[in-house]
């Protein structure tokens, strides 16, 4: 009788113990391919630190310095802090050669949207996960631009529940817009893009919604477009279970519009917080691919 052995999970460190970092921790711990060996922040009273300790995960208030000290026991670093901090953290991690998956909108290197370019990202040390709105909307925008061939203008409007948008995310709004627009231009080959972020204070919180609109003088085969976005929905749903199209592509004159919704798994925040899930699930997918086991 042969005994099949399974490689040990990839040992990860998470820097940032806020909303995104804590949701990421729960998803990493749920993955058979990953484990969190260090959850590092700066505030001892952080609810994320308390949750991690309760789950038996090693924690530190030493931030990136704690990661450097434990580097020999870490295979990959996730950054869930802020754009400004991520720039400094990458400067420290880069010489160590550790893979670095950045969930902030710092945008210091290769964009990674798993549904679009995961295979191209496997050998990159640094990966930018763009933004939550970018992960949700850019793949659908690309479907439109690929079929149209040329668009004159592309706009993405993302709406998220206020309670799920933490202090670091609020401090990064300019970077969020800039990075989402850069990723849209890169993946969709369009020069005129606009990103709008709406933080909705409604209680109970709204489910994350993303609307994509394009203006083009090209005639688009609407049936072909619907087939394309349905295939893309299925691809994204494979790693973000709550992702779905709620308004299929419609045409009004030279404008084409569709809307997607992202419902979270409810791991840390209520299920309405799909803006957390879309980027943490994408980051986990990228890390799992790095383990060599997803392939």
UniProtKB/Swiss-Prot annotation:
One GO molecular-function entry: NAD binding
Active site: 132 (acyl-thioester intermediate)
Any one GO biological process: catabolic process
NAD listed as a keyword: yes
Enzyme class: oxidoreductase
Residues annotated to bind NAD(+): 17-20, 164-172, 275
Reaction catalysed by this enzyme: acetaldehyde + NAD(+) + CoA = acetyl-CoA + NADH + H(+)
Pfam families: AcetDehyd-dimer
Keywords assigned: Aromatic hydrocarbons catabolism, NAD, Oxidoreductase
Entry's EC annotation: 1.2.1.10
Protein family according to the UniProt entry: Belongs to the acetaldehyde dehydrogenase family.
Protein name listed in UniProt: Acetaldehyde dehydrogenase 2
Source organism of the structure: Salinispora arenicola (strain CNS-205)
Lineage of the species this protein comes from: Bacteria, Bacillati, Actinomycetota, Actinomycetes, Micromonosporales
């Amino acid at each position: 009788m042969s005994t099949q052995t399974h490689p040990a999970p990839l040992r990860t460190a998470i820097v940032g113990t806020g909303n995104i970092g804590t949701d990421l921790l729960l998803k990493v711990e749920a993955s058979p391919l990953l484990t969190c060996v260090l959850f590092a922040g700066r505030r001892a009273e952080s609810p994320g630190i308390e949750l991690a300790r309760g789950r038996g995960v090693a924690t530190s208030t030493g931030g990136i310095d704690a990661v450097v000290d434990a580097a020999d026991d870490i295979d990959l670093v996730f950054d869930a802090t802020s754009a400004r901090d991520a720039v400094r953290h990458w400067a420290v991690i880069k010489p160590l050669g550790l893979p670095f998956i950045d969930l902030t909108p710092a945008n210091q290197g290769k964009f990674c949207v798993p549904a679009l370019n995961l295979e191209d990202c496997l050998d990159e040390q640094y990966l930018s996960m763009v933004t939550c709105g970018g992960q949700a909307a850019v793949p659908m925008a690309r479907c439109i631009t690929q079929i149209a061939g040329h668009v004159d203008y592309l706009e993405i409007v993302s709406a998220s529940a206020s309670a799920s948008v933490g202090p670091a995310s609020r401090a990064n709004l300019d970077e969020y817009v800039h990075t989402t627009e850069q990723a849209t231009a890169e993946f969709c080959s369009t020069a005129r893009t606009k990103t709008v972020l709406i933080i909705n204070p409604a209680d109970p919180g709204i489910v994350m919604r993303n609307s994509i609109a394009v203006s083009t003088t090209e005639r688009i085969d609407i049936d072909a477009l619907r087939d394309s976005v349905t295939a893309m929905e299925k691809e994204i749903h494979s790693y973000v279970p709550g992702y779905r199209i709620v308004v299929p592509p419609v045409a009004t004159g030279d404008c084409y519009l569709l809307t997607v919704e992202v419902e979270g798994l409810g791991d840390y925040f209520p299920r309405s917080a799909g803006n957390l899930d879309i980027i943490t699930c994408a980051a986990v997918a990228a890390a799992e691919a790095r383990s060599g086991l997803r392939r």
